[in-house]
Every structure is written in C-alpha cells, then in structure tokens.
Amino acid sequence: FTMDETWNGRDIFIRFGGVRSAFYVWLNGNYIGYSQGSKTPAEFNITELVQNGENKLAVEVYRFSDGSYIEGQDTWRVSGLERDVYLYAAPKTRISDFFVYADLNEDGRSANFSVKVDLFNPERFTGKYKIDAVLKGKRVLYKMDYIVAIDSTNSVEFQTTFSKVKPWSAETPYLYNLKIMLTDPQGNLVESFTQKVGFKRVEVKNGNLLVNGKAVMFRGVNRHEWDPVVGRSITEETMIRDIQLMKQHNINAVRTSHYPNQERWY
C-alpha cells in the first residue's frame, strides 16, 4: 500500500475485522504482532514502522490455533481473511472511546441521558481543549460543551434529563443523532464522531419481557455469518437479504450464533 503523506504527525493503525483462526503480521520486514480469535477484531499501532511512499504488508494465516477448540461448534471450518482490513489515522490527542446511556423512564415520555467521553493524550500536549455534545432529532434536543485540560488520560461526562422524547421501538425505530466534537486550544476541530441514539426501556415484570411497557414475545432464530457462494465473507447486501427474509416470516429476534458479528450487523 502507499502511505498518504497527509497522515504525517498522526498515529496510524491497521485493523483486521476477522481472521480465522490466527495470524502473524509484518510491515516492511518488521514484525508487528500476533492475534487469534476468528471473530474478534485485531488492531495494531504501526506508526513507528510505516514509511512515506510504498509499504509492504505480510500476513501469515493459520487455519487452526489453540483457540480453535472453542470456535468449532456447529460450523464450517474454512479459514482466511473473513472481514475488512483497513488503515486509519488518528490525532495524537484524541477521543479514545465514548459511551452513551439513553434510558426511557417508566412514564414512557421522559428520559435520562448521559455521555461519557474518554480522552487520550500520551504526549501530554498542554492547553485547554473543548468537548461538544449535540443531540438532535427534528430539532436540537441537547447541546453542551466542556473546557478541559487533558492529562495522559481522563474522562468527561455529560448528564441531563428530558421531559419528553420520542421512544424507540421495533415498530417505530426513531433515532436521534448524537455528535461529539473535540476542539484544540487554537479552535481547530481535532476529531468528531456521530452516533445514532434511541430511547427505550427494557424490563421483566411478572414473568413478561416489556419493551417500553409493552409485553413482547420473542420469535427468534439462530444465525451464522454464512453465504452459500462466498462463505464467511458477509457483505451488507447479504445482511439485508437475511433481515428481509426474517421479517417475511415474522421473526423479531436473532441470536448471533456464538461469536461477535460484524459491527454493521448490529
């Protein structure tokens, strides 16, 4: 692959979405690392090994590993790169993770909402950074910002309550858009993320599973990531086809076999 020079000064990662069953990785003749676990993504920081211009990546895949035993349940034993492999660059000071909590209250209208943002600053750049969180439906429902001095790692949490939200359900899957932004001391946008958010309430009462206060009977199936033509390399089109087939047969729940599925499925 060819390195994009606009990525200079950023941390560069390579991500393997899924490799069965284990693999070693080298970049430009240098050993990067090893991973096993066919359905668990593996990510490596290659900042120190990547070079401007042409780079040579080598991957050695093993069909079986000492983790194969727990993966060998009711499945076809095929091996290789099953999911996407891609590079991405991230700023040195960045949002490392975030968690959204959206809980519909028992009245079915009001809700509690919080966002926890984890920050990463290994080189301890100084100055005041700003973090914005904006939740929007047909209109802006919530907007807040914090000014923080980032240490090596720290977190910021936004919390609020809403008197009225539009609930999410399988019949009316209404979603809000949450945007999280990190701005540096000079006012430059460093990083931003967008996440869909739905407000729902799931509970068990008197032996019944309730979603937003209404009893739901699960009619579920077990699903493997499998295509009769391409095997385990599932595309979005294959996922949509499976969902359409399930909806045609009134299926409303899916057990994703015994392993994590591709993120797109969720």
Regions inferred by a protein language model and the residue ranges of each:
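N-terminal carbohydrate-binding accessory modules
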Residues: 99, 179-249
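Beta-strand-rich binding/interaction modules
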Residues: 27, 110-148, 156-158, 178
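Short beta-strand edge segments in extracellular beta-sheet folds
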Residues: 88, 147-149, 196-200
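Extracellular recognition modules
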Residues: 58-60, 177-181
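Short strand-edge motifs at loop-to-beta-strand transitions and within beta-strands
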Residues: 40-44, 154-160
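Conserved, mostly hydrophobic/aromatic
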Residues: 29, 85, 176, 213, ...
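Short, solvent-exposed loop/linker segments at the N-terminal edge
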Residues: 102-111
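Accessory beta-strand-rich segments of carbohydrate-active enzymes
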Residues: 1-97, 122-123, 139, 253-266
